[in-house]
């Protein structure tokens, strides 16, 4: 079941088409990676979903209904350009933002207390935002995004400004929110986070959707029949099932070679031949990373 769908969305500016007939479907309770280089159109799509701007063609639907002002309460949005009121105290700021999202005074107080404790910020509740470090301010902005327990979280580069410890803390919170029922749309050009977090992804480049699907299916579709084998012995002879692309000596008598399967050859065929030639220590298929795929597509490779 898809919680959010964008159908044939186009957005034009005077001299530039920011989105060109983009369609995506985001499964309920997934972590969905909206990927693309800077300027690809990701933020434009996010702004349309948040009803900050309108699309020129196409439509967005949430929970099967055409996008409507009532859906704003279903969304928590953490923009890349963070914005907190510097002179306001942390607790007051969170209370103000919670009430904008429709929480009662009592419920807001309870949730603010819970989240400040959870992220280790209780003692900062009475301090002004300008007194916080960048990482602390990021945490406060994250709390403001999730306070009203929205069904859809849109996080635009959520890890910028975090050290590795706090980035992991936020990752854990994202997983927990997903497990409790939230759908997370995660917009980024940092591919290592995508590998760790996302179930499904869509790649936007130059205003168009280039590919989408589950992370596993996309990675499998970009496999190119390459294998890495660690072994003792020699692979100098000609082979019926594979070509040796390159070889390095790992230690003493242990070597590692990159193999390219010949057309139509299966892993079992290659492994059987290897076992007859050498003492195999490990044999692994090369699966491209999301980063490899991203670079390949954006720089004009396979699409």
List the predicted regions and their residue ranges:
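ABC transporter nucleotide-binding domains
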Residues: 4, 11-205, 211
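A short, local hydrophobic-aromatic micro-motif
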Residues: 7, 20, 56, 245, ...
């Amino acid at each position: 079941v898809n919680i959010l769908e964008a159908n044939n969305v186009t957005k034009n500016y005077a001299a530039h088409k920011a989105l060109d007939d983009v369609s995506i479907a985001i499964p309920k309770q997934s972590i969905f990676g909206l990927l693309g280089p800077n300027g690809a159109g990701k933020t434009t799509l996010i702004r349309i979903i948040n009803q900050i701007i309108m699309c020129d063609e196409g439509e967005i639907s949430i929970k099967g209904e055409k996008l409507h002002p009532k859906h704003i309460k279903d969304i928590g949005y953490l923009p890349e350009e963070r914005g907190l009121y510097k002179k306001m105290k942390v607790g007051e700021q969170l209370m103000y933002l919670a009430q904008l999202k429709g929480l009662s005074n009592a419920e807001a107080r309870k949730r603010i207390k819970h989240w400040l404790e959870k992220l280790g910020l209780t003692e900062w509740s009475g301090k002004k935002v300008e007194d916080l470090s960048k990482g602390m301010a990021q945490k406060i902005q994250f709390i403001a995004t999730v306070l009203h327990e929205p069904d859809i979280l849109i996080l635009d580069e959520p890890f910028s400004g975090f050290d590795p410890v706090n980035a992991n803390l936020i990752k854990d919170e994202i997983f927990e929110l997903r497990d409790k029922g939230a759908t997370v749309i995660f917009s980024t050009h940092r591919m290592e986070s995508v590998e760790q977090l996302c179930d499904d992804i869509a790649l936007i480049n130059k205003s168009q959707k280039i590919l989408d699907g589950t992370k596993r299916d996309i990675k499998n579709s970009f496999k190119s029949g390459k294998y890495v084998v660690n072994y003792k012995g020699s692979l100098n002879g000609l082979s019926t099932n594979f070509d040796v692309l390159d070889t390095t000596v790992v230690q003493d008598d242990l070597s590692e070679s990159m193999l390219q399967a010949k057309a139509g050859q299966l892993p079992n065929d290659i492994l059987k031949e290897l076992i007859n030639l050498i003492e195999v220590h490990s044999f692994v298929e090369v699966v491209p990373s999301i980063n490899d795929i991203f670079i390949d597509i954006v720089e004009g490779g396979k699409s």
